[in-house]
Design a protein with these regions (language model features):
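Active-site-adjacent C-terminal substructures of enzyme catalytic domains
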Residues: 140, 146-251, 261-272
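Divalent metal-binding pocket/active-site signature
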Residues: 100-159, 175
């Protein structure tokens, strides 16, 4: 199973520990956007997570974060990334594209920096991730899509999913710890008959408790089936559709000669119990238990102690005075 868009940092764990948590649930590929570490450590932080991901037994591709900082002038970020940084990162082996382009007003208005980041990604032949968090599906949305983003996961309504597909995007339907957008948007397939090949499943953000108690992409697929999708269609939306979107269908997304031997064994396509997990031909988990020996990643000193409060805190700093009377 593939997670087409997600942020490891939402789990409050490292890439290695996240992989350890999701492998028993059948996840063998992830497309991560390390936006949070980019806001703190800049390009070296992104490279750190990229290199950590490359050493793991499942496929983890990195989307180079865009819009760093995410709200210029409204926050004190630890770093700022520009077009040159994006262009440089596109040469790294495990970079699959540009992370979600959150500055949708800027793209629609022709902001030079945003369009430059998109152009650098497209020149490298990679995929531009979208983030259009607005109910306005008129000219502003059309201008945003024309700017280059190829997918979007911010839809919450059936009409959002329909609009994205009609404009040539892939609609990513997310079920995470705080996002419950599959049920409403999947109706574009089950009710309106849109081609399911233009839809992809993802999580976006999963807290550690969700991973432990509920699962990962297996949870999303089960939920999609419960909303009326045929099991094989829901599975396709978490495998082959994702691979094709990122131009990796010759490597993954299907069980066929020449592909990576990433697969799960299950006795029930609808209930989807994950009984065995293989990645690159190696058994990594069986009956919910991790079998692979995955060593912790040694984070360097520069990645530690990055919270700077400006002063030494005391208990009194957390006092809240009651108003008089």
């Amino acid at each position: 199973l593939c997670d087409a868009h997600m942020h490891v940092e939402s789990g409050m764990v490292t890439v290695t520990e996240f992989a350890r948590a999701v492998i028993p649930h059948g996840t063998t590929s992830m497309f991560i956007d390390p936006h949070e570490i980019a806001n703190v450590l800049g390009l070296p932080g992104v490279k750190l997570m990229h290199d950590e991901a490359m050493g793991l037994p499942i496929n983890i591709w990195v989307q180079m974060p865009s819009c760093v900082p995410s709200a210029p002038g409204l926050e004190h970020a630890g770093a700022e990334l520009g077009v040159e940084d994006v262009a440089a990162a596109m040469q790294w082996p495990n970079i699959c594209g540009l992370g979600e382009m959150m500055n949708f007003p800027g793209v629609a208005a022709g902001d030079a920096r945003m369009l430059g980041e998109i152009a650098a990604t497209q020149m490298a032949g990679k995929t531009v991730g979208g983030h259009y968090a607005s109910p306005d599906l008129g000219p502003a949305f059309h201008a945003y899509v024309a700017g280059g983003p190829a997918d979007d996961h911010e839809g919450t309504r059936k009409e959002d999913a329909i609009a994205r597909v009609r404009q040539g995007m892939r609609a990513m339907l997310r079920l995470g710890s705080a996002w419950y957008d599959v049920a409403t948007q999947v109706k574009a397939i089950t009710e309106d008959g849109l081609d399911s090949r233009n839809f992809i499943l993802c999580t976006d953000d999963s807290h550690s408790g969700t991973l432990v108690n509920d699962g990962h992409m297996n949870r999303v697929v089960r939920h999609a089936i419960a909303q009326g999708l045929k099991p094989i269609t829901a599975i396709q939306m978490a495998t082959l559709n994702t691979a094709q979107h990122f131009g990796m269908e010759r490597e993954l997304g299907s069980i066929a000669p020449g592909r990576r031997a990433d697969m799960i064994l299950t006795s029930d396509l609808a209930a989807l119990p994950v009984e065995l997990v293989m990645a690159r031909g190696e058994v990594l988990a069986e009956n919910g238990a991790l079998q692979a020996d995955i060593a912790p990643y040694p984070y360097p000193d520069f990645a530690r102690g990055t919270v700077h409060m400006g002063k030494q805190l005391s208990a009194g700093d957390f006092d809240v005075e009651a108003p008089a009377g």
